[in-house]
Regions:
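Surface-exposed cleft-lining segments at the edges of enzyme active sites
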Residues: 109-117
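Short coil/loop linkers at secondary-structure junctions
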Residues: 63, 96-97, 159, 192
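Conserved donor sugar-nucleotide recognition element shared by glycan-biosynthetic enzymes
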Residues: 46, 120, 178
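Asp-based, Mg2+/Mn2+-dependent phosphohydrolase catalytic module
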Residues: 2-28, 125, 129-132, 139, ...
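An amphipathic alpha-helix signature
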Residues: 46-55, 83-88, 146, 150
Length: 258
């Protein structure tokens, strides 16, 4: 004969569940990075941009075939994802009559590669809609050439997405940085830092900025900067995930309630 749990036992279990739920940090605002966070930038943008740059380098006088130069750029990129020395390494390998002209051509082509059709990660839209339905305020911050980033956002259909409250563009001239965008979002929403979650892929960028401001940080470890290791505790996210859809299953309470 099965014994029914006592009222005391049932109440104790409910109390334990309540205490467990209360330990989950409340999140009222989520800030997403764009590249390699909401869509596959490495596959859809970075590799085509390197091919575009390889074509420009050859046109400017680099001595090599398109396939050779493209593969050399990818090898150099994996060794130096911050692009500090990639052009000089490729030029040194192949040779050119005017290295400066080739370097300028590569830089301009890489950062101005035409934006074609782009597709969000499969779980991105369902996550945005889940957060919106939960009453969470949603923002996007993205870094790079502003015109190019705006074209990416439009190609992904995010300018028409009602779940997104506002998109901030951090530029290369650093007139707007991700940290300043985070500060502005906090000031405009009035939401405490410990109720804001930042989701991104770069330890030295949005993760460091979020941690420095006392916000929660989740790193999506894939794409262009997947191999980058945190330099210190300030670049170490609270959680690491491999799929954007995993955000909703993390130990947070997503709600508009204070």
């Amino acid at each position: 004969m099965t014994r029914k749990p006592s009222n005391h036992s049932t109440k104790r279990k409910k109390s334990q569940r309540g205490r467990a739920a209360s330990k989950r940090p409340l999140i009222r605002c989520v800030i997403f990075d764009l590249d390699d966070t909401l869509y596959d930038c490495l596959g859809q943008r970075v590799r085509p941009a390197h091919r575009h740059a390889a074509e420009a380098m050859i046109a400017a006088g680099l001595k090599g075939s398109l396939d050779q130069v493209y593969r050399a750029r990818l090898r150099a990129f994996h060794a130096d994802p911050m692009l500090r020395h990639i052009d000089s390494e490729v030029i040194r390998h192949f040779g050119a009559a005017d290295p400066d002209a080739v370097s300028r051509a590569a830089h301009d082509a890489y950062f101005n590669c035409p934006v074609g059709k782009l597709t969000l990660f499969r779980g991105a839209l369902p996550l945005l809609h889940f957060l919106k339905k939960s009453g969470v305020r949603i923002f996007i911050t993205t870094f790079g050439d502003v015109d190019t980033q705006q074209a990416k956002v439009a190609a992904l259909g995010l300018t028409r997405e009602p779940a997104i409250e506002k998109i901030y563009y951090a530029d290369r001239a650093k007139r707007v940085t991700k940290e300043s965008a985070f500060r502005q979002i906090q000031a405009e929403t009035g939401i405490p830092a410990d109720q804001i979650l930042v989701v991104g892929d770069r330890p030295m960028s949005e993760i460091r900025a979020a941690k420095g401001l006392g916000m929660h940080a989740v790193r999506l470890r894939r794409g262009e900067f997947a191999s980058q290791r945190p330099a210190d505790a300030g670049e170490r996210a609270d959680h690491e995930i491999k799929n954007i859809s995993q955000v909703r299953r993390l130990s947070f309470t997503f709600s508009a309630a204070e």
